[in-house]
Regions:
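PLP-dependent amino-acid enzyme catalytic core
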Residues: 1-271
């Protein structure tokens, strides 16, 4: 996976009176940081002689895993929660060759548990959170790339759901630098409103859950959309929540990780 672009955001910087950079994971092949995870996970699966790989997902990992599995000639299995179904995403995942299982289940954590049990039984490589260190290491590469490109940044802000992404960033974080995670209860940002904490045991080891994880309100998500649009960027709600929440931080040299493209959320974006 090639380095994603790091850009300075002059209009967002002016609005917040801070220096703000954006790490554009949206430029990865399927438009999200999950591509980094998929490539490493598939390589690990092949090394261990698995013929098939699978995950439970709200969207981005499912699309990414389906895409790269076909390239690397592996079968892929995707578990989706019925309440999270995006028809466009579902069609895309199926068109990429994945076998899809849709479950009526109350939350994402339970879907992780169910799918993990089934994958173990069916000898499918498990790409769910807390199953392989490759998920963590893939995200560590993001912060390594930022440090290599920029010496001023000392604060990193990203979205959080199950924990793998932010744990990977934390692994590469330098001493005295700051890392914050944004979550939301808004129905607009479904990928970060379950806040499943599937990596909970690791999260409480490395973060102060009350200080380091910040809730974004719906108005902040909309503000994030507007600010990103002013820079010519259109991103998924989770990334808009990150940019729209910068007023909550005192730090002056900040990098926001723009984790996903709006292309998988175009219908909701129209609304």
């Amino acid at each position: 996976m090639k380095n994603s672009l790091l850009i300075y955001a002059p209009k967002i910087s002016h609005f917040y009176k801070k220096n703000v950079w954006l790490k554009l994971e949206i430029l990865n092949p399927t438009g999200s940081h999950k591509d980094r995870e998929s490539v490493l996970l598939i390589k690990e699966a092949k090394k261990k002689n698995f013929k098939s790989i699978g995950c439970a997902s709200t969207g981005n990992l499912a699309i990414s895993l389906a895409f790269f599995s076909k390239i690397y000639q592996m079968k892929s299995n995707i578990w989706l929660r019925e309440k999270d179904i995006n028809i466009d995403n579902l069609k895309l995942i199926k068109s990429l060759g994945s076998k899809v299982f849709i479950k009526k289940i109350s939350n994402l954590s339970k879907l992780y548990d169910l799918s993990s049990q089934l994958m173990k039984k069916r000898k499918i490589f498990n790409a769910n959170p807390n199953s392989s260190n490759s998920k963590i290491l893939a995200n560590t590469e993001i912060i390594k790339e930022i440090y290599k490109a920029n010496k001023k940044i000392d604060t990193f802000i990203t979205c959080i759901n199950n924990g793998s992404h932010i744990l990977g960033l934390k692994k590469g974080l330098r001493k005295k630098h700051n890392l914050y995670g944004i979550f939301s209860k808004s129905k607009i940002a479904t990928s970060i409103n379950s806040f499943s904490r599937y990596e909970y045991e690791n999260l409480i080891k490395h973060f102060n859950m009350k200080k380091d994880f910040i809730e974004a309100k719906e108005k902040e998500i909309f503000n994030g959309y507007k600010l990103l649009a002013s820079e010519g960027l259109f991103c998924e709600p989770a990334s808009a929540a990150v940019v729209g929440s910068l007023n909550k931080f005192k730090e002056k040299n900040i990098c926001c990780i723009i984790t996903g493209s709006v292309h998988k959320n175009l219908r909701s974006f129209q609304k």
